[in-house]
Amino acid sequence: MRILFLHPNSPDYLCASLFHGLREIYGTNCVDLPRFDCMYAPIKRGVLNKIRGHGFTLYGLLEDIPELEEERFFIWQKNIAAFDLYIIADIWNSWRMLDQLLEHVDTRKILIVDSGDTNRFFPWNNLKTSWRGIWRKRKLLKHCLGYAKREIPARWSEAVGPAMQLLPNSLYKSLLPEKILPISFGIPGSKISYITPAQKTQRFTTHIVDADIASVLHHNKHTESYAFTNEQDYYADIQKSMYGITTKRSGWDCLRHYEFAANGAVLCFQDLNKKPAMSAPHGLNESNSICYTNFTDLENKLNAIAEKDYEKLLQNSYRWIEQHTTAAVAQRLIASIHPTLPKD
């Protein structure tokens, strides 16, 4: 299968992880348009420092494929219709490319990826746009192969925003794409490091995103920025930690969950039980993570974990992250739409 991956060429963790997985699986049969500059090695430190999180984990990993330069050149005029699947990554910033693409290819070959942290679906997030404009954008999605999204709310009314709250419940779903597909972040398989409990020297990672817990553990840092500027130091700190504190921030899913698990820190996830079932991360439960509400609750739960129980938690955490490599996430997404791809 040949895939054309259309994107706005700006850092986005979901688009980056999906493209990394697709390129790992399909090689030269996955063409990025335009060239996804920050994904390729070598990448300069100044570029990484402009990316949220200093570009840890996902950026500057891929080997460039010079022959794809010829394929990209004049592609809209010469060979735009030569692919089996078209992925519009980051629909909020790429909808104009979708509009252009629909002039050339079958709608049923187009997969939409919504990488936004909001649980609103395109185009319902910005209702300052005229209703005519919103309706036109919504029609762009009609009959597309699928709409992949991380943050999927429990109630469809939340997907369209407060301006539409007066509609009957039965109409909400009609405002959304026909086929909604869950998707999550992923982590390159090469970033998984297998650490044993015996190698642990501290209970928690240095940087803690839960301000209340960080304030109790005075030696731990809570900031809105990152505690490390070097990926190697960041990973080393995780690897010597038994647990990593994580929470919902802009959205439920974030790369931190996967970085912690890949480096051997069992996730302690605040209010995980409140996460909508279809929202990422998927597959976390009491067998591979700790759900807590506050510091007292967390302390009580951790104190009740025996050494052998922690070892089992860690094993299950590794099983979970092995199912959420970039390649595994990409493979599941393709499998979910492959039977419905039109045959030429």
Language model feature labels by segment:
Residues 285-295, 304-307:
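Conserved acidic donor-binding segment of nucleotide-sugar-dependent glycosyltransferases
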Residues 307-341:
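A charged, aromatic-enriched C-terminal amphipathic alpha-helix characteristic of glycosyltransferases
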Residues 2-286, 327-332, 336, 340:
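Nucleotide-sugar donor-binding catalytic core of glycosyltransferases
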